[in-house]
Design a protein with these regions (language model features):
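C-terminal alpha-helical interaction modules of replication/initiation AAA+ assemblies
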Residues: 2, 6, 14-160
Length: 160
């Protein structure tokens, strides 16, 4: 989760440190890909929800207080829409939606950027699973660099 979060905040140096740490353990790349896909799919769904329900997201983003019932309600709706929360999981609102900053992260990406990242994830996943890509530390670093720089890569027409 920390790696996906660092990349969604476009903090590549932090992501590199996390990758180095992961590869010093019994790291399994398909689990990372799965976590990334869940994270970026949630970002995409949050953007779709925000487009259809701008007032809910505005309520969520405009609050400054913790334990505000309006914010908790908005966060719960966002969590359900994104697939990060299930019915009855109100107690998870703070760590999953509020503290994680996922709504703010979703605002940092365009739909095109998120679709591109999701496509790259599918390609990387298929490549790893078929043996076309070896999930070495270097390959994972390059892949994460692409994600962190998706905006620039799309603008330049490079590597998409």
């Amino acid at each position: 989760y920390e790696l996906a979060s660092a990349l969604s905040q476009k903090q590549f140096p932090k992501a590199l440190a996390i990758i180095n740490s992961l590869f010093s353990t019994d790291f399994y790349a398909p689990l990372m890909i799965s976590a990334f896909f869940r994270h970026y799919w949630a970002l995409f769904r949050i953007r779709r929800f925000a487009e259809a329900n701008p007032q809910v997201v505005k309520t969520f983003l405009s609050s400054r207080g913790y334990k505000d019932p309006a914010v908790d309600g908005a966060a719960y709706e966002i969590g359900l829409a994104s697939g990060l929360l299930q019915e009855g999981e109100q107690r998870k609102i703070y760590p999953v939606i509020i503290a994680s900053g996922i709504v703010q992260a979703a605002r940092k990406f365009s739909d095109e950027e998120l679709k591109t990242v999701l496509r790259w994830l599918l390609e990387f996943d298929a490549g790893v699973k078929t043996g076309k890509i070896e999930a070495t530390e270097h390959e994972v670093q390059l892949f994460c660099f692409r994600i962190a720089r998706v905006s620039e890569l799309i603008r330049s027409g490079t590597d998409i």
